[in-house]
Amino acid sequence: MKPAKSSPVQIARRGLMLVISSPSGAGKSTIARTLLETDKHIGLSVSVTTRPRRPSEVEGVHYHFKSVREFERLRDSDALLEWAEVHGNFYGTPREPVEQAMAEGRDMLFDIDWQGAQQLQEKMSADVVSIFVLPPTMTELQSRLHRRAEDSEEVIQTRLANSRAEIAHWREYDYVIVNDDLNTAFDAVQSIVKAERLRRDRRHGMFDFVRELLEETPSL
């Protein structure tokens, strides 16, 4: 007769704020989408933006699309954890769902730029794990933007012009990944998430677990 299989040990921990940034076309959105599809413990922090909705985007799934006036109302009432102006449009992170997720031990994914990442680091540094995704070459970055076929040529050129300034902030991130192969880059992100979830300072339930472990007296 086989011994009964014990249940997995569950140790309470605080949620993780996983920030993934990159210049447009480097692959952060694809990596983020794949991570959400394969890891049920991660939820997406849906940003608000004044940017026009692309044909492939769904309200409330990819972004909450707002007018400039609506966005300013949220910003001025301190309802946003961070906000930034990118390519002439405003982006921001709603405060309430993030703070609730952290307290409940749920991980949140942030697909935001360096300005937003910087603000999150300043406000909630203990919870933030930041990853910057680089393209293998600028030529490949340009090719990816054209293959995406969702922006006008003028917008693509603006994104390319801004990409060098964005890449200059790579040193501000905890981890940096070169996305020359999507599967390899995704595997690296998964490894980072697994390791960060095991950090001692994030697992507040470990104190009770160790105390009970030391108090346990095995029966003979």
UniProtKB/Swiss-Prot annotation:
PROSITE patterns: GUANYLATE_KINASE_1, GUANYLATE_KINASE_2
Pfam families for this protein: Guanylate_kin
Reaction(s) the record says it catalyses: GMP + ATP = GDP + ADP
Positions of ATP binding: 22-29
Ranges where the Guanylate kinase-like domain occurs: 15-194
GO molecular function per UniProt: ATP binding; guanylate kinase activity
EC number: 2.7.4.8
GO cellular component, one term: cytosol
UniProt keyword annotations, A-Z: ATP-binding, Cytoplasm, Kinase, Nucleotide-binding, Transferase
Entry's localization field: Cytoplasm
Coiled-coil regions listed: none
Enzyme class, first EC level, given as a word: transferase
Family from the record: Belongs to the guanylate kinase family.
Function: Essential for recycling GMP and indirectly, cGMP.
Matching HAMAP family: Guanylate_kinase
Record's protein name: Guanylate kinase
Provenance organism: Rhizobium etli (strain ATCC 51251 / DSM 11541 / JCM 21823 / NBRC 15573 / CFN 42)
